[in-house]
């Protein structure tokens, strides 16, 4: 049993996956914090949930006082990132520092790097994103690591690719894919489905963030979390159809259609910025993490089976 006081900001798919990983490892004093103070599902007995405004450093400090580690897994709607994400991160960072919490772990993605012309995505790439969401991610990562270097709080960042899994709906491999597969209909994706594309299983993401929190060597850096083997998107979807016992049917949206959809759907408009992910090989390298902490990502077959089961029981 681990009685450390642990705080998780955000009760979405990632925050809940961190919660699951903590419970698996015997942690007990776990608190989720989101704005309404309500959970989307029944929580384990080791976990409680509180309401809180992550943009308010004073409120954050009051909520996290006495914590051993804080996980930042909160985020606004996809189309609100540039306006609303930095204030959330700033509020959590300043509140954690004010309260004297020793460790802060941030669940991040890969947008800050921008296009890589098909070359592997690794941690030493420059922050070259030109789109607004990529720039937002870069600015937040810099602020967090600057705080670490200044000795204000120990910070570690875990970065994932496009993720999928139980509870994940608004994703490139989410609710436009798995419900259709279960019904034998065409899964809707984007770009060239015959290019390799690394996908992260959200449970592996949560476990990796907990591992970072437990290792002093993790702090002061950004790490790419472990992923199962990189497949083409077609191979990934064909595997999902096979597991579901259905015949593969894939519908891929092109860039022009995505732009047209963006005139009416805010999320589609924002996806145009990261079109490069689906129009060139997108292979993520997690070898530094594997060398430092070991890597045992869930095989896609097992992860997809668990994901399909979650969607099957959703309604």
What kind of region is each of these model predictions?
Residues 90-139:
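Conserved Rossmann-fold NAD(P)-dependent oxidoreductase catalytic core, especially the SDR/UDP-sugar
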């Amino acid at each position: 049993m681990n009685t450390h006081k642990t705080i998780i900001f955000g009760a979405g798919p990632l925050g809940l996956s961190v919660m699951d990983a903590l419970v698996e490892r015997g942690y007990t004093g776990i608190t989720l914090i989101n704005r309404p103070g309500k959970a989307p599902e029944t929580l384990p007995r080791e976990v409680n949930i509180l309401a809180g405004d992550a943009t308010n450093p004073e409120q954050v400090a009051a909520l996290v006082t006495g914590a051993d580690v804080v996980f930042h897994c909160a985020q606004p709607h996809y189309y609100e990132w540039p306006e609303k994400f930095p204030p959330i991160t700033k509020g959590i960072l300043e509140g954690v520092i004010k309260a004297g919490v020793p460790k802060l772990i941030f669940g991040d993605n890969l947008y800050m790097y921008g296009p890589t012309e098909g070359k592997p995505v690794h941690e030493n790439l420059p922050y070259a994103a030109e789109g607004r969401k990529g720039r937002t991610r870069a600015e937040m990562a810099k602020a967090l690591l600057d705080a670490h270097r200044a000795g204000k709080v120990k910070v570690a960042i875990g970065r994932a690719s496009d993720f999928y899994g139980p509870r994940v709906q608004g994703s490139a491999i989410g609710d436009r894919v798995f419900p259709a597969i279960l019904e034998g209909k065409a899964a809707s994706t984007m770009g060239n489905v015959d290019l390799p594309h690394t996908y992260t299983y959200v449970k592996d993401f949560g476990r990796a963030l907990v591992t970072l929190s437990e290792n002093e060597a993790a702090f002061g850096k950004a790490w790419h979390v472990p992923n199962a083997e990189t497949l083409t998107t077609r191979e990934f979807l064909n595997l999902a159809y096979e597991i579901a016992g259905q015949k593969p049917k894939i519908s891929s949206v092109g860039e022009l259609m995505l732009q047209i959809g963006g005139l009416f759907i805010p999320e589609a408009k924002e996806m145009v910025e990261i079109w490069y992910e689906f129009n060139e090989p997108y292979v993520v390298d997690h070898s530094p993490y594997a060398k430092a902490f070991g890597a045992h990502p869930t095989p896609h077959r097992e992860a997809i089976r668990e994901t399909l089961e979650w969607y099957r029981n959703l309604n």
